[in-house]
Amino acid sequence: MGARASVLSGGKLDAWEKIRLRPGGKKKYRLKHLVWASRELERFALNPGLLETSDGCKQIIGQLQPAIRTGSEELRSLFNTVATLYCVHERIEVKDTKEALEKMEEEQNKSKNKKAQQAAADAGNNSQVSQNYPIVQNLQGQMVHQAISPRTLNAWVKVIEEKAFSPEVIPMFSALSEGATPQDLNTMLNTVGGHQAAMQMLKETINEEAAEWDRLHPVHAGPIAPGQMREPRGSDIAGTTSTLQEQIAWMTSNPPIPVGEIYKRWIILGLNKIVRMYSPVSILDIRQGPKEPFRDYVDRFYKTLRAEQASQEVKGWMTETLLVQNANPDCKTILKALGPQATLEEMMTACQGVGGPSHKARVLAEAMSQATNSAAAVMMQRGNFKGPRKTIKCFNCGKEGHIAKNCRAPRRKGCWKCGKEGHQLKDCTERQANFLREDLAFPQGKAGELSSEQTRANSPTSRELRVWGRDNPLSETGAERQGTVSFNCPQITLWQRPLVTIKIGGQLKEALLDTGADDTVLEEMNLPGKWKPKMIGGIGGFIKVRQYDQILIEICGHKAIGTVLVGPTPVNIIGRNLLTQIGCTLNFPISPIETVPVKLKPGMDGPKVKQWPLTEEKIKALTEICTEMEKEGKISRVGPENPYNTPIFAIKKKDSTKWRKLVDFRELNKRTQDFWEVQLGIPHPAGLKKKKSVTVLDVGDAYFSVPLDKDFRKYTAFTIPSINNETPGIRYQYNVLPQGWKGSPAIFQSSMTKILEPFRKQNPEIVIYQYMDDLYVGSDLEIGQHRTKIEELREHLLRWGFTTPDKKHQKEPPFLWMGYELHPDKWTVQSIKLPEKESWTVNDIQKLVGKLNWASQIYPGIKVRQLCKLLRGTKALTEVIPLTEEAELELAENREILKEPVHGVYYDPSKDLIAEIQKQGHGQWTYQIYQEPFKNLKTGKYARMRGAHTNDVKQLAEVVQKISTESIVIWGKTPKFRLPIQKETWETWWVEYWQATWIPEWEFVNTPPLVKLWYQLEKEPIIGAETFYVDGAANRETKLGKAGYVTDRGRQKVVPFTDTTNQKTELQAINLALQDSGLEVNIVTDSQYALGIIQAQPDKSESELVSQIIEQLIKKEKVYLAWVPAHKGIGGNEQVDKLVSQGIRKVLFLDGIDKAQEEHEKYHNNWRAMASDFNLPPVVAKEIVASCDKCQLKGEAMHGQVDCSPGIWQLDCTHLEGKVILVAVHVASGYIEAEVIPAETGQETAYFILKLAGRWPVKIVHTDNGSNFTSAAVKAACWWAGIKQEFGIPYNPQSQGVVESMNKELKKIIGQVRDQAEHLKTAVQMAVFIHNFKRKGGIGGYSAGERIIDIIATDIQTKELQKQITKIQNFRVYYRDSRDPIWKGPAKLLWKGEGAVVIQDNSDIKVVPRRKVKIIRDYGKQMAGDDCVASRQDED
């Protein structure tokens, strides 16, 4: 924090600490606000160093100000802090933040006026648009664009990954895209193109805005004058139909057209929509995490509360109830003890350091030490005393310049108050916070090297001399405390001589701590008391000394009394006689890697899976392996107190007689917390820069070198069984990361990165690529120097317990790394041999496809489409599959390609990347990325069909998208593309179909076959061509259908089909029209499905029928396709509909429409009810609702989405027309009882509850804290009727807001029927009737009335069934899974039906067919092996 704290110094810091956060508030700015601000700036990709000057603050304000309106609270706080800091730098006197903002505004207004005057004078001189993406003037006077940097792109990708479209994304996007061109913005969007749903929303917004732009800026008639630029269209602004040069010209013309800013505004509009969709936060969702500090939780709670749409009273209730209710258990206990009237300040004080990670206690210690400091220090804090400021010193490591909160050193063990182990500060019973900085004895500035068994900040495996401080043995408590070890002690490393300052006889001397010396020997000095002569032997011979007994000596602040020898010694020595008294120990720490804390998923326990029987040879092999592992400390034995178990087994190693131990961690993996993978992919050799010297290392026993969290080890327990259960099994648990456990890769990678970090910093000229246990080390050093560095690296790794075996240490090329073969100036994949086989199984083909995919990185032209087709459907791995002719041909072609070895080259950052794409046919594409022709960096293929129907242009865009993403990952930039498509073809397509996956810079390359559009649909009807009205119909039950057409020239045709659907017949009808028409034709359909397929102009399809239509379309000269709504009485459409419906559609529903409309006018029932009651198609029923003006106020309310216990009702009062309506909702069904009550009193409410209980089974009523619900009358009524009353939040958080939404729904229905009733109470009962019986939807598609009856009846049946289930519990089930032939079990029988049973195996509930289970009675603890009861027992 040293750098961050240096933002202000001296008088400026005093001025800063006088400014109040709010006008009239108590809190003032402190140093911590500067630290926070500098951290926040890093998140916005801004340099924290800018805070040190007023100009820097101005620049920050300029970046943040545009985003303030849409920004989050954090952004606003950051802006306020920087504005206040600016005033301090400029020495503008301000009292609080508000005043600082006003002064800032005044300054900005002044500077705006100055700039306006200067702009006129400087026009033409300054062409720089932005700092971020400058469009600069080169030496020739041309405007040149500097492309967006990979660092900015990386920051943007990280923002999306971390924030996941939370509100902070918008200001961050705004800051990162300052001054960008549309092409830059498209590059940014391309990098996050994988978020398809979000990109789709963004695309729609951009489409709308572009259309609006085109509407407001119509094209001028006539040709453009020479030398004049054309005006940008909407698609030009979005960078789809404009070139980079055009964009630069628009942005730098006079007057400029800021296409970048306009496009950015459109994107921000789209991002706003996305944010609203992705971040719907309700106050009920705000809960304190198990390790979240209370202060952070309160911040989130109030931030959300401010946005909540509720009255002040409701917000008050939320603060009183929800804040405590949703705190974590630790904080909740403390808050409840404080009582109901506690202030927020008291709550935060009480919960400080509780509920957060252990390091939060450091903050509390810091605060306590400051609180106990002298009054002068307090005066200085307040700014009353201008004396010299005391330097900040860390409590954790003792260094100056930062506080414990920001300390990077590992946390010291033990309590921060008394120094003892076994508890933390919050649990300390010591009354005095004896934690003043002077108590820490850190001799000679070595305070940074603190004692900790687990971590070493500076010297991982150094021998260390540690002085364990005991309390003064002369004190009263000395006798009690003998042997108590305190961690408040120095640690002295042995890289240098351990010299310390000692105090003896009132004199200070320097002495050497010598654990090899028996006695303490000091140079000539006078000591009080009697002495005896003595001779002592040393390395230089014997010397005469004086022996003084019972001498008091102070070493590192710790006192000891013992014998001291005085004589002519070359150096003062403190020997073991005194070192043992002060608890000094010599330590040899090993494998000091910091353990990563790991937890199970909330609410889950460890695995308890039984060990299955193993053969004798496997047991012997496992016993040998585990004995060896135990000796090495990788595993340790556990006793019967550990209830957890994971099964193990053994397999033979490949081409060896040795055995390998495998642990089946599937169950533990399900229960372990999720981890963030540190690396998202593997490094690629094409991204390596060419290096003079290269070495490849492999870390031996990688996982077994990293310790596992002590508290988690018990869950990894496993058992080696004995033969024939002769003795109990031997049980072990892992002390290190186990193979096969889900946390091992992430923890190993994280540990390895931390270990390599200091080496990387010391040797920036060396490149280390790290993936799991494979290390690639490259440098431009001479080979001798390079190898010296490699040895340093190996030594560095060895200090941390990582070995790099010589066996896998590759010094000479070719290097085998990550499946690649690396040479000094080229690379390839390790040799690939395709197997020759007579017959191919599914497994063989899967392996073959995997090999070919791997080879396609560098071998251009590899295809696998036909081979993949063979694997379609669910097939057993051993099933033999005959190769089709196409697959055999494809395989033969691939063999030819692989015959000649192909190499790739390394990346040169000074040259441009170029990507060239070729079409291979059958939807397959190949591409090469290179910097020099015929020297490929890498190659690849693409054969994915994103939809059933597509065309080449669409697929080409997908290939480009894939290559762009791949290039950004490997090289941090996108290549220039060379595509086999004419510019005209491209523009024809994208004028209609532009979207959020834009093409970067590209040029046409004439590589056959070229991509083209095979046919085009007309925009307007073709005059003089015959018009075909087409339609199709099918019966769902019989699958019979008809397709046909009627033309405007009197022709008609109907063709019957079998085994068809409505959608197929619609397409068949179009196909018929195309077959029977001339070269020009107009076709009118009422099918949106058919229209959607054909308008996208596909040229290939998986559907045979669509392929036929495509063939017909290619033959035509002109085709116009139009859509009309069905059943609207449109001439030709109505005729053809009747023609194809005869004998197909069961009932002509037209008769029911009038009745349905009539009923809707009365009851305003929803479309589901009408579709069900009058046998109408959903589209017709929806049309009736759509045409009703009273039903268009809002969308329909969702019913029945909450599934709760049958006896829960929620009650609430709502107000309408000055009257009170009491509403009761049955939570599970959405059924309503409501009444207008004379007054909102307890008496009326109690009477209503009794009426409700008389009609329905009511077990629980959930209400708010209104006075009528908390009254004695209601309590008495509930007690009499046996109803439990709940307030606040019900236990099921899903059921929140049920009454609120029903109130709105009821008011909406009342509004629809109000004019039919004179009195409100009549309208209320009409609305209740409509809601309960005339609206269908939700669970089961019932009305609420039907649903409540169904739920109550089901509840009664379930209770009856429950009685029978207790009988079923006495049975055990053995069962087989779909493919696995081994019998599993025993499982618990939950339910037995005719065709299947429901069983519970461990915690999983499964449904298994009857034919795959054996049900037996539970005969106690007898083992059910393959040859005992389970196999022989008849089925029950």
From Swiss-Prot:
Domain Integrase catalytic stretches: 1202-1352
Entry-linked PROSITE patterns: ASP_PROT_RETROV, ASP_PROTEASE, INTEGRASE, INTEGRASE_DBD, RNASE_H_1, RT_POL, ZF_CCHC, ZF_INTEGRASE
Region (Dimerization of protease): 490-494, 538-544, 577-589
SUPFAM superfamilies: Acid proteases, DNA-binding domain of retroviral integrase, DNA/RNA polymerases, N-terminal Zn binding domain of HIV integrase, Retroviral matrix proteins, Retrovirus capsid dimerization domain-like, Retrovirus capsid protein, N-terminal core domain, Retrovirus zinc finger-like domains
Region (Interaction with human PPIA/CYPA and NUP153): 190-228
Region of interest (Interaction with membrane phosphatidylinositol 4,5-bisphosphate), residue spans: 73-77
DNA-binding region positions on the chain: 1371-1418
InterPro entries in UniProt: Aspartic_peptidase_AS, DNA/RNA_pol_sf, Gag_p24_C, Integrase-like_N, Integrase_C_dom_sf_retrovir, Integrase_C_retrovir, Integrase_cat-core, Integrase_Zn-bd_dom_N
Domain Peptidase A2, residue spans: 509-578
Annotated binding of Mg(2+) 1, by residue: D698, D773, D774
Residues in RNase H type-1 domain copies: 1022-1145
Residue ranges of the motif Nuclear localization signal: 26-32
Zinc finger (CCHC-type) residue numbers: 392-409, 413-430
Residues reported to bind Mg(2+) 2: D1031, E1066, D1086, D1137
Lipid anchor positions (N-myristoyl glycine): G2
Site (Cleavage): 133-134, 364-365, 378-379, 434-435, 442-443, 489-490, 588-589, 1028-1029, 1148-1149
Regulation: Protease: The viral protease is inhibited by many synthetic protease inhibitors (PIs), such as amprenavir, atazanavir, indinavir, loprinavir, nelfinavir, ritonavir and saquinavir. Use of protease inhibitors in tritherapy regimens permit more ambitious therapeutic strategies. Reverse transcriptase/ribonuclease H: RT can be inhibited either by nucleoside RT inhibitors (NRTIs) or by non nucleoside RT inhibitors (NNRTIs).
Keywords, alphabetical: Activation of host caspases by virus, AIDS, Aspartyl protease, Capsid protein, DNA integration, DNA recombination, DNA-binding, DNA-directed DNA polymerase, Endonuclease, Eukaryotic host gene expression shutoff by virus, Eukaryotic host translation shutoff by virus, Host cell membrane, Host cytoplasm, Host endosome, Host gene expression shutoff by virus, Host membrane, Host nucleus, Host-virus interaction, Hydrolase, Lipid-binding, Lipoprotein, Magnesium, Membrane, Metal-binding, Modulation of host cell apoptosis by virus, Multifunctional enzyme, Myristate, Nuclease, Nucleotidyltransferase, Phosphoprotein, Protease, Repeat, RNA-binding, RNA-directed DNA polymerase, Transferase, Viral genome integration, Viral nucleoprotein, Viral penetration into host nucleus, Viral release from host cell, Virion, Virion maturation, Virus entry into host cell, Zinc, Zinc-finger
Record's protein name: Gag-Pol polyprotein
